[in-house]
């Protein structure tokens, strides 16, 4: 599963793991991606989205219809 949120666009960040002796190792900071299924009344069907935890909160606040309309306007197939 790609570490990419369909709602917020969150992608992995890159940085370093730093040990006690301050040696640096490259690492990747992945967003908290969850696979969630939502019922979308305007489409009258279920839609499965890969969303971050922040994306889930965005859906709770704005509503699934508004969020799905924005995703479809970007040309993403659901």
UniProtKB/Swiss-Prot annotation:
<dbReference type="InterPro" id="IPR026569">
    <property type="entry name" value="Ribosomal_bL28"/>
</dbReference>
<protein>
    <recommendedName>
        <fullName>Large ribosomal subunit protein bL28</fullName>
    </recommendedName>
</protein>
<dbReference type="GO" id="GO:0006412">
    <property type="term" value="P:translation"/>
</dbReference>
<dbReference type="InterPro" id="IPR001383">
    <property type="entry name" value="Ribosomal_bL28_bact-type"/>
</dbReference>
<keyword id="KW-0689">Ribosomal protein</keyword>
<dbReference type="GO" id="GO:1990904">
    <property type="term" value="C:ribonucleoprotein complex"/>
</dbReference>
<dbReference type="InterPro" id="IPR037147">
    <property type="entry name" value="Ribosomal_bL28_sf"/>
</dbReference>
<dbReference type="GO" id="GO:0005840">
    <property type="term" value="C:ribosome"/>
</dbReference>
<dbReference type="InterPro" id="IPR034704">
    <property type="entry name" value="Ribosomal_bL28/bL31-like_sf"/>
</dbReference>
<keyword id="KW-0687">Ribonucleoprotein</keyword>
<feature type="region of interest" description="Disordered">
    <location>
        <begin position="1"/>
        <end position="31"/>
    </location>
</feature>
<comment type="similarity">
    <text>Belongs to the bacterial ribosomal protein bL28 family.</text>
</comment>
<dbReference type="Pfam" id="PF00830">
    <property type="entry name" value="Ribosomal_L28"/>
</dbReference>
<dbReference type="GO" id="GO:0003735">
    <property type="term" value="F:structural constituent of ribosome"/>
</dbReference>
């Amino acid at each position: 599963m790609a570490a990419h949120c369909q709602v917020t666009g969150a992608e992995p960040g890159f940085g370093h793991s730093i040990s006690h002796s301050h040696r640096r190792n490259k690492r990747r900071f992945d967003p908290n991606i969850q696979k969630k299924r939502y019922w979308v009344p305007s489409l009258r069907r279920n839609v499965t989205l890969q969303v971050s935890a922040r994306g889930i909160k965005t859906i709770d606040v704005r509503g699934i219809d508004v969020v799905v309309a924005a995703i479809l306007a970007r040309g993403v197939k659901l």
